[in-house]
Amino acid sequence: MYERILYPTDFSDEAVKSVDYIKELKGAGATDVIILHVIDRRGLNDLARFAKKDFAGILVDMEQKARAEIRPVEEELKGVGLKVKVRVEQGGPCDKILQVADEEKVSIIIAGSHGKSNIDSMLLGSVSYKLVKRVNIPILVVKK
């Protein structure tokens, strides 16, 4: 039923907890997981000035850090017999998640209910809320 899972992560507690649900779906026929981390470029110009580093250098650092944080999750999911693909993308989180879901032809998205920035969620609306409103496939939103 849910053979291909998209797991967008920002490494928040809720996102990490989602891994348990992904492993449960292995027993229900899941075969593939796409782990996605989206680097949100908003505000990076200010960060580059503050860090006295060029924009491209910051993006490279962020991608390397994301891949390092994903690696243990990738190994854990492979350890239960799932095929895992890792994608680190740049863009608006909601739009990029929807784009990757379409490109990868996933059957379900499993996402955390809140990201790392609760203030951002209160001001702008959470990514999970936007996904629920816009997605055309099943989505499981995992609470802490």
Which role fits each region the language model picked out?
Residues 1-53:
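Small/aliphatic-rich secondary-structure junction motif
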Residues 54-67:
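A short acidic, glycine-rich active-site loop
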Residues 111-133:
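Glycine-rich, Arg-bearing micro-motifs that act as flexible, cationic patches
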Residues 50-54, 103-104, 127-128:
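Short, hinge-like loop/turn segments at secondary-structure boundaries
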Residues 49, 75-109:
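Structural beta-alpha unit
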Residues 34, 85, 140:
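Conserved beta-strand positions in the Rossmann-like core of class I SAM-dependent methyltransferases
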Residues 137-144:
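Short, flexible loop segments at boundaries between secondary-structure elements
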